[in-house]
């Protein structure tokens, strides 16, 4: 059964590490947030929050929909996590409660409250780029890391037949 590695995969070295550990592939998410192709889905405030974020600037919050969601820290997530704040309702009730407010925050680009879903790999990205560049960096970085690994330790067992070791 093929296994995909997910979570924290942000660079070609991360891809290579997952493959070296036996994954058949990787699932990448955060690397594509700050891409030109995704720009239409982000406000200026969201882009600013993503660009300045490091791994420690993400939080798991239920303040968005009632379900746990990793996002960039904002005044919105901080207020919902503050002592004495009400507990978010479960999904979908919380979304009904705050959905219009979140829509207005996005529509009017209220920067202190702006946030975006993002994994802890967000710190690897500091600018908007085309998806083609992200893909080239992932593939090129993985290939270089796997070449270094192979040179240092020899090819993986089964690599000569083009198979990923089990």
Q: Predicted segment positions?
A:
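Conserved active-site-proximal phosphate/metal-binding subdomains
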Residues: 2-4, 10-166
């Amino acid at each position: 059964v093929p296994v995909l590695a997910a979570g924290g995969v942000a660079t070609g070295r991360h891809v290579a590490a997952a493959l070296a550990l036996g994954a058949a592939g990787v699932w990448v998410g955060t690397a594509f947030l700050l891409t030109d192709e995704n720009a239409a889905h982000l406000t200026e405030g969201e882009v600013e929050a993503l660009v300045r974020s490091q791994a420690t600037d993400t939080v798991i919050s239920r303040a968005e929909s009632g379900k746990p969601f990793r996002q960039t820290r904002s005044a919105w997530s901080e207020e919902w996590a503050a002592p004495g704040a009400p507990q978010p309702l479960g999904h979908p009730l919380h979304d009904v409660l705050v959905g219009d407010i979140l829509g207005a925050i996005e529509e009017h680009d209220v920067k202190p409250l702006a946030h975006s879903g993002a994994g802890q790999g967000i710190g690897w990205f500091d600018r908007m780029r085309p998806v083609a560049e992200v893909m080239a960096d992932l593939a090129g970085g993985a290939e270089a890391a796997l070449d270094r690994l192979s040179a240092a330790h020899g090819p993986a067992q089964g690599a000569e037949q083009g198979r990923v070791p089990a």
